[in-house]
UniProtKB/Swiss-Prot annotation:
Keywords: ATP-binding, Cytoplasm, Disulfide bond, Nucleotide-binding, RNA-binding, Transferase, tRNA processing, tRNA-binding. The gene is mnmA. The keyword Glycoprotein does not apply. Residues 149-151, 311-312 are annotated as: Interaction with tRNA. This is tRNA-specific 2-thiouridylase MnmA. The keyword Transcription regulation does not apply. Its EC number is 2.8.1.13. Catalyzes the 2-thiolation of uridine at the wobble position (U34) of tRNA(Lys), tRNA(Glu) and tRNA(Gln), leading to the formation of s(2)U34, the first step of tRNA-mnm(5)s(2)U34 synthesis. Sulfur is provided by IscS, via a sulfur-relay system. Binds ATP and its substrate tRNAs. It comes from Salmonella paratyphi B (strain ATCC BAA-1250 / SPB7). NCBIfam families: PRK00143.1, trmU.
Length: 368
């Protein structure tokens, strides 16, 4: 008697990647069902329409593939475990990455538990562009095959146990192949553009959105030489390396170079700027990271040579990691790096393998 097929619950977002993931798993012989997560209580008509359209697209794809679609509301979990922390970080003058938190707390925790306990799933699956490989009895996280779409940066908090329970079907494909499969199948999501913006907050204007929850506090914009040249509307709206939206022109002492944010003085509510994207004040020789997560869940000790990304889509930076204590490491870059931003994540790699990462606590500036 043959074994019954393993049951997989696919996180259906209403996008093309999760749609094709569901079909690929069907082809591989799994018993597939979909799940649409509602993680935000809409407070305006436009956002409600977007969420409703995504649900309708997810339902249409599931109908086409002949699979059941479940819906679940994780809005309370999202607010408590993602959004409140996100606001706290902004208040402290840092720039958090809520997509990483959302994957940690919602997609690979709340969703994983719900799928296993309430729906009897053997696995969950998502449309992330990553791969998994089992080495010495532990699941490893690998970069997606499509280097342009690789999303391992956003999944570094996952442990080997979570990866072992997760499938990533499109991680073995390139994006154009995924779109072609969707077109050939006649899926409504085939030509739908990729979502941008904060995970579940969607496409709405970020500045307007943040202003609803945190009161803006205008303050001075000063140059690295101490000259006051403008006013900012709130430090939370600015991040290191930012060029647009400063509201100041380009010329000073004959230089036409644009202004960039090089530092934030949170205590005095001052934004510090300099001209040129390679200004020494913007460069760092390394960083201190905390809140570490290693995929193999083994504590890190000693020293390691590897590469690091300090933001998504960045070219890998060769570096040396030194353990400071149980939950802090020092990272020294081989070459100075621009716009290393506290609150963002530093994610480490050995070749194709994502080792883990941590939150950038402070940068080690090239010039003090």
């Amino acid at each position: 008697m043959s074994e019954s097929p393993k049951k997989v619950i696919v996180g259906m977002s209403g996008g093309v990647d999760s749609s094709v993931s569901a079909w690929l798993l069907q082809q591989q012989g799994y018993q597939v069902e979909g799940l649409f997560m509602k993680n935000w209580e809409e407070d305006d008509g436009e956002e409600y329409c977007t969420a409703a359209a995504d649900l309708a697209d997810a339902q249409a794809v599931c109908d086409k593939l002949g699979i059941e679609l479940h819906t679940v509301n994780f809005a309370a979990e999202y607010w408590d475990n993602v959004f409140e922390l996100f606001l706290e970080e902004y208040k402290a003058g840092r720039t958090p990455n809520p997509d990483i938190l959302c994957n940690k707390e919602i997609k690979f925790k709340a969703f994983l538990e719900f799928a296993a306990e309430d729906l009897g799933a053997d696995y969950i699956a998502t449309g992330h562009y990553v791969r998994r490989a089992d080495v010495n009895g532990k699941s490893r996280l690998l970069r997606g095959l499509d280097g342009n779409k690789d999303q391992s940066y956003f999944l570094y908090t996952l442990g080997h146990e979570q990866i072992a329970q997760s499938l990533f079907p499109v991680g073995e494909l390139e994006k154009p192949q995924v779109r072609k499969i969707a077109e050939d199948l006649g899926l409504v999501t085939a030509k739908k553009k990729d979502s941008t913006g904060i995970c579940f907050i969607g496409e709405r204007k970020f500045r307007d959105f943040l202003g609803r929850y945190l009161p803006a506090q205008p303050g001075k914009i000063i140059t690295v030489d101490g000259d006051e040249i403008g006013e900012h509307q709130g430090l939370m709206y600015h991040t290191l390396g930012q060029r647009k939206g400063l509201g100041i022109g380009g010329t000073k002492d004959g230089s036409e170079d644009p202004w960039y944010v090089v530092d934030k003085d949170v205590e005095n509510n001052v934004l510090i700027v300099a001209q040129g994207h390679e200004h020494p004040r913007l460069m760092s020789v390394g960083l201190i990271a905390q809140q570490l997560h290693w995929v193999d869940r083994e504590p890190f000790t000693g020293t390691l040579r590897c590469t690091v990304k300090t933001r998504y889509r960045q070219t890998d930076i060769p570096c040396t990691i030194n353990a400071l204590d149980d939950d802090r490491i020092e990272v020294i870059f081989d070459e100075p790096v621009a716009a290393v931003t506290p609150g963002q994540s530093a994610v480490f790699y050995s070749g194709e393998v994502c080792l883990g990462g941590g939150i950038i606590e402070q940068r080690l500036p090239l010039t003090v």
